[in-house]
């Protein structure tokens, strides 16, 4: 992850609200994996700034590589992304068998055999499999056998892809929760990114199960009576799901580290990113202070930064890492605009 910000972002000119807390997460993920990522995007803010016809902010690099993005419905996005993963898995399995056939052929040259073997050795590694794929295609290009021609014809499916499912808290905590739970429980190598604004942002700021107790918003004008649903704890209860809670403005290093670890983990992962929204009604400057609001949320103890890495448990280490420090409660005020008072 060192030097990640020198990489080309494959998300640009999104048209999101000025200061949006969601787009920095998506932009960062495209910098890390954009040349080989698939995105299934739930309906909501992230699908509006993510693809408002006839334009899309997702772009390509100099090689013509970029995120493959699609949107189904609000309620089935997790299942939709899961289907994308299974389809890619099935195609790659067939292509792998064809590469094995070529590698075992007596007619294959030493160069072709070496390229095939390197591809097979890196088959499950997204970082190294891309270069191995380029070498394989170059070695097979021009070969006359039907198997080689089919491999080259389907070259876009050869490299290991990074499968992502994007959506907001209204989708992940409420309407699409059943699908999110199903996908995480599957044990498959898939990544879920939740842009947590703690309300239904795209439809005007209604309360969701991600809204915290006391939060004032539509359908909760007197303050939400029930506490926030702990999606992270639910996912951690499985024991084999990588889970992280991040806030890019508060701790960029932790955010980048967790995103990289989640993608590298050979199983399901869930990342919940705190995303201030203009509907939060941030005083004195509004979304100019988006990143500062993330810092305040973490410093006060309102939003904790942590990760749960099952790979550490297998190595005999504590899988849970708490990055944020003890909260400073003096930063939290009673929600009374005329007389805000510290709660401690």
Regions found by a protein language model. Give the residues of each.
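Proline-centered helix-kink/hinge sites
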Residues: 268, 337-340
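Glycine-rich ThDP/TPP pyrophosphate-binding loop and its adjacent helix/strand module
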Residues: 159-165, 174-190, 195-329
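Glycine/Thr-rich phosphate-binding loops of Rossmann-like dinucleotide-binding domains
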Residues: 49, 280-281, 343
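Cofactor-binding active-site loop characterized by glycine-rich and histidine/acidic residues
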Residues: 2-194, 200, 205-214, 221-226, ...
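Single conserved hydrophobic/aromatic residue that forms the stacking wall/gate
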Residues: 332-333, 340-343
């Amino acid at each position: 992850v060192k030097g990640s910000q020198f990489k080309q972002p494959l998300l640009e000119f999104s048209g999101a609200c000025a200061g949006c807390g969601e787009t920095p997460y998506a932009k960062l993920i495209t910098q890390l994996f954009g040349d080989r990522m698939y995105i299934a995007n739930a309906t909501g803010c992230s699908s509006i700034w993510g693809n408002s016809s006839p334009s899309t902010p997702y772009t390509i690099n100099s090689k013509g590589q970029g995120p493959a993005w699609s949107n189904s419905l609000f309620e089935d996005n997790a299942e939709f992304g899961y289907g994308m993963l299974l389809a890619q898995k099935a195609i790659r399995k067939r292509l792998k068998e064809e590469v094995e056939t070529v590698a075992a052929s007596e007619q294959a040259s030493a160069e072709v055999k070496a390229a095939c073997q390197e591809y097979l050795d890196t088959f499950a590694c997204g970082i190294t499999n891309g270069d191995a794929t380029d070498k394989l295609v170059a070695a097979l290009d021009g070969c006359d056998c039907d198997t080689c021609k089919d491999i080259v014809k389907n070259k876009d499916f050869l490299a290991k892809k990074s499968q992502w499912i994007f959506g907001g808290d209204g989708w992940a905590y409420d309407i699409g929760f059943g699908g999110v739970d199903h996908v995480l429980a599957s044990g498959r190598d898939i990544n879920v990114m939740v842009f947590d604004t703690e309300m239904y942002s795209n439809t005007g700021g209604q309360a969701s199960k991600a809204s915290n107790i006391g939060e004032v918003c539509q359908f909760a004008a007197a303050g939400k009576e029930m506490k926030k649903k702990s999606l992270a704890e639910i996912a951690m209860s499985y024991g084999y799901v990588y889970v992280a809670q991040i806030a890019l403005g508060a701790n960029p290093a932790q955010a980048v580290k967790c995103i990289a670890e989640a993608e590298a983990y050979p199983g399901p992962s869930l990342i919940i990113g705190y995303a201030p929204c203009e509907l939060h009604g941030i005083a004195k400057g509004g979304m100019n202070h988006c990143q500062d609001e993330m810092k305040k949320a973490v410093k006060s103890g309102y939003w904790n930064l942590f990760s749960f890495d099952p790979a550490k448990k297998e190595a005999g280490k504590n899988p849970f890492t708490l990055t944020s420090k003890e909260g400073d409660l003096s930063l939290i005020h009673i929600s009374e605009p005329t007389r805000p008072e510290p709660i401690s």
